[in-house]
Amino acid sequence: MTEAMARHAATIRLAVLILLAFGGAATGMAEGRRVQIITSFPPSFFEPFRSAFRDRHPDIAVEVVQRKTTAAVIDIRTHKRPDADLFWASAPDAFELLKRAGLLAPSKPRPTGAPQTIAGYPVNDPGGRYLGFAVSGYGLVYNPSYLTARGLPVPHNWADLAAPVHAGHIGLTSPSRSGTTHLMVEALLQSLGWERGWALWSAIGGNLATITARSFGVTAGVARGRFGIGISIDFLTEANAAGKEGNRFVLPGETLFAPASIARLAGSPNPEEAELFIDFVLSPEGQRMLREPRIGRLAVSPSAYGPQETPPHLSEIEGIFNRTGFDAGLSAGRYELVNLIFDEWITFRRAEHARLWRSLQAMEAALLSRPDEEAARLLTRARAALTRPPVSAAELDDPARFRNLARVPRGLPVPEEQARIEARIRSAIAASAAEAGDSLRQAAERLAALGWRDESQTGARP
């Protein structure tokens, strides 16, 4: 070997050693302590917690994956996030769904001083799989300026949203895209009963101006005057109202008031780090952070409130859960069925659904000054068709029938049994819409003979 060749070989050996050294260092960094969180909360909520936790534990990297609650549940159930450690969200039925699937690890309650229940609802899962850290009120958000400019009344309960005066002035998110909306839909179904609850949701659906892509879009739309009323959660209202003259929040009598929770996922690759993050969220410091204006949440720990501070909303909702008796287990068992019915009945048919409801409302009003027995019978028939759920309460007596329903991504095959259920639901909805439309046409003819002119669609918002 010549001297030049020897020098070249030595250079190569040195380069290899340097690469190995730096590669090893890089690998060591990549394999350092970390915790990955799946959450439905916005960055304005989780970033302060991530920063404060890193101050306490600078050796632990905190990775956050933001997903809508429903999408997060799908990701976790289909193991698309095998490296995730924690699930952090508002909707208790989403946690119950994951618990039933065996996807949540046990986690011991922390000494927060929180009561066992708030308004009758357990703060922590009695089975020890998820822990409440904050409290959420679910209700109505409205823009006072929008309502005043149009002479619209402020809604105070869910039934107000079905009033004809609010047609075209309401926004919400589909429950299949938002755990917040799903919880509110389910709460009314449980409070009023399956068939009465769906009748009310159908009427509210007929008044919708839009269905937004995310929960945050509802409060943002109200704040910007795209529509005047929304269905939302209290902290999203506060987040959008910051620095604005605008949104107000109402807790209806049949509302839902529930803990937001955090849980460690089964098979978490970083269980120690995950438990440390839970420790922090439930620590006095973490609980006090919830009360900061930039976050604006209700803490479960009484020590987070000042001596003269009364947690807002608590006096308004005392005993609500005792009346409604919300059952997270029942909700979890029919989670996808409720989403499927809402989307097929209201989301995907919004324009036609609104048109039918506007016609019905206009003719019911006309009937007051033009009494006609046959027209009244036809309108009663139309209302019954518009408010009839495509799955009856009697069919729910066999809960196993719908338990295996799952949200299937576009382009993937739907299981045969689910395809049959979906087809039957679509067929029932289409038949009811056709029945309502036929009855409304006949009623319109009778009222027209009495001098009535249908102007219900004139200038209507789509």
PLM regions: where:
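C-terminal non-catalytic accessory extensions
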Residues: 363-462
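A ligand-binding cleft/hinge motif common to bilobed small-molecule-binding domains
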Residues: 93-97, 223, 227-246
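Early extracytoplasmic/lumenal segment of secretory-pathway proteins
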Residues: 31-96
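A bilobed periplasmic-binding-protein/Venus flytrap-type ligand-binding module shared by bacterial periplasmic
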Residues: 141-146, 257-273, 289-290
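Extracytoplasmic ligand-binding site segments that recognize negatively charged/polar headgroups
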Residues: 47, 83-84, 90-212, 216-223
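Periplasmic-binding protein-like
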Residues: 136, 169-173, 200-205, 211, 243-270, 280-301
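Paired acidic/hydrophobic, glycine-rich loop segments that form the ligand-binding mouth/hinge
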Residues: 84-89, 211, 226-233, 248-250
